[in-house]
Amino acid sequence: MKPFGMIPFFIPHVGCPYVCTFCNQSRITGQSGISHLTPDYIKETITDYVGSKRNDKFWEVAFYGGSFTAIHRDLQHTLLGPTYEMLQEGIIDGIRCSTRPDAVGDEAITLLQSYGVKTVELGVQSMNDQILVEAKRGHTAQQVKEAVSRLRKYEMTVGVQLLPGLKGETWQTIIETAVAVSELKPDFVRIYPVLVIENTELADQYRAGEYEPLSTEQAIRYCAFLKAWFERHNIEVIRTGLQSTKELDSGNSLVAGPYEPAMGELVVNEQYKQCIERCITAHIEYFVDKDLSQWNVREQLNTFTALNLSIFYPRSLTSKVRGLKNRNIVYFQEKYPHLNINWYEDSTRNTVCCCIDGLQYVL
C-alpha cells in the first residue's frame, strides 16, 4: 500500500458557530484568513505538492481547521470545485474534511459526495457531556453517535479527533470516552492532548487558576492508554500530538500544556514500558508471592532476592523499546534497583521479548 501524501488547506475557525474555550485555530495552524484560497491557488498548491511523485503516494487533499460542512454552501463549492477537478484528472486520489458532529446532515453529506469527498473527520474531543459543556463545544455525545451513524449510512470513511486534558478530565472520563468511541467503530482516531493557546478562554482560566493543564508525563499516560485501547479494538490511531509548527515552536502562542513534537514517539515508548512492567508485576505476583494484596510490588522487590531480567528486541524497535534518550532504561533502573536488567538488540527476532529468570514473555 502506498504511503499517504497529505495536501492540507486550513480554513481556521470558518463555519464554527461557537468559540470553544481551547480554540485559536490561527495560532495553532500558523495561518489566518482564507482569502488566498482561490481556485488557482488550490490547483497550484496541489500541483506543487505532487510534482513528479504522482505514483509514489496516495495523494489526498484535506480541509482542516474549521467546520467544513457548516460553512456557506457557496464557499464549499468554491473550495471543492477545483479540488474535484484535480481528482477527476487523476492528479490526486482523495479528498477529506473535518467538521463538527452536529453539522453532518443528509444534505451536507450528499454535497460532499457530489465532489468526491470520502472521508470526514469529526471533532469529537470527549464523550463526556459535562466536559463538552465546560469546553463550550455546543454539541453532545449523543450527537456524535448520530453523526457517525449517518456517515456510515452513506458509506463514508469516519475519523474521530479527541482532546484529552480538557477541563474536568479524569481517568474516569478518559475511560468513558475510550469505551464510547470504540463502540462507534470509527475507521481511525487522532489524539491531541490539550494545549493552552494564547487568546483563548482556556488561557484566561489557566491564568486565573481555574484550569490546570496536563503535565507532559500525564498526557503521555492518557495517550498511551487511549492508543492501546483503540488498537485492541482494531481502530487505527493515525496521529498523537499536534504537529510542530513555527507558531507553536516560537513560544509566542503557547501559554502552557504538554507541547512535545515527539509526543507520538513518547507514547509508543510508554506503551512498551507498560508492557514490560506488566510482565514484571505478573511474574512477581505468581512466582514470588501469590498474595501481594497487602504489599506494594515495589516494596516487595526491594526485599526480595534480585531477579534477572533481559529484554530482547529487533533493531527496528530499539528506540521505541529503550525510549527516547533511553527514558525507559532510566525508569526501570530507578524504580526497580534490585532487578538485574539487561537490554539486547537481537537482529534474529521480529518481536519484543521479556525474559525473567529464564521464563519468556512475548510482548
Q: Which residues does each PLM region occupy?
A:
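N-terminal pre-triad scaffold of radical SAM enzymes
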Residues: 1-30, 43, 47-69, 98-100, ...
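Auxiliary Fe-S-binding modules of radical SAM enzymes
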Residues: 2-5, 211-363
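Short glycine-enriched loops at secondary-structure junctions
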Residues: 12-16, 192-197, 243
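Short acidic/His/Gly/Ser-rich catalytic and metal-binding motifs that mark active-site loops
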Residues: 18-20, 197-203, 248-250
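Conserved non-cysteine loop/helix-boundary elements of the Radical SAM core domain that shape
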Residues: 28-40, 44, 65-220
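A generic secondary-structure signal
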Residues: 44-52, 82-86, 111, 150, ...
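Short helix-terminating capping/connector loops at secondary-structure junctions
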Residues: 53-58, 89-92, 300-307
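Short acidic/polar active-site loop segments enriched in Thr and Asp
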Residues: 59, 93, 118, 187, ...
